[in-house]
């Protein structure tokens, strides 16, 4: 069993590491944290330009068809510099739900996410429910109106669209 990284994975790791060590010093990160969005819009655009937002999505949706190992390499480097951009909330969580959805417009939404044009937020957590989606109190009416409470909606302040479990 070969547990070595591929050449592409080593390039990805080096690319993320270089960003984290050259463009993400403490003062820059604190400026981002204290901004209205809680992250750097310039860094988010750079993530899109570098193809990082496309990694977990299939090629037919504008993605790079990356693997969980690719994501883990990125998160290892992100963790070293405490990267605050909403990659987990936007790309992995909300993007993962979009990718697996049966929405007619999912490709359009994912292409907007991959390009950095749109951000999404997953609203699935409810008070006293933990991560259990089998017992959701929130209701979504036929008119699309949401009735109920969601908590810990990651990336809510930046979201162009919300994915709500009801």
Description of each model-found segment:
Residues 1-88, 108, 112:
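Amphipathic, small/basic residue-rich leader segments at the start of a protein or domain
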Residues 66-67, 132-134, 155-159:
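Short glycine/proline-enriched turns and hinge-like loops at secondary-structure junctions
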Residues 83-104:
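N-terminal glycine-rich flavin-associated loop
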Residues 116-127:
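A short, Trp-centered hydrophobic/proline-enriched beta-strand micro-motif
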Residues 132-147:
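Cytochrome P450 C-terminal beta-domain/meander region
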Residues 147-166:
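A short core secondary-structure module
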Residues 98-102, 141, 164-166:
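Short beta-strand-to-turn element immediately C-terminal to the catalytic PLP-Schiff-base lysine
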Residues 72-75, 95-98, 163:
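Conserved protein kinase catalytic domain
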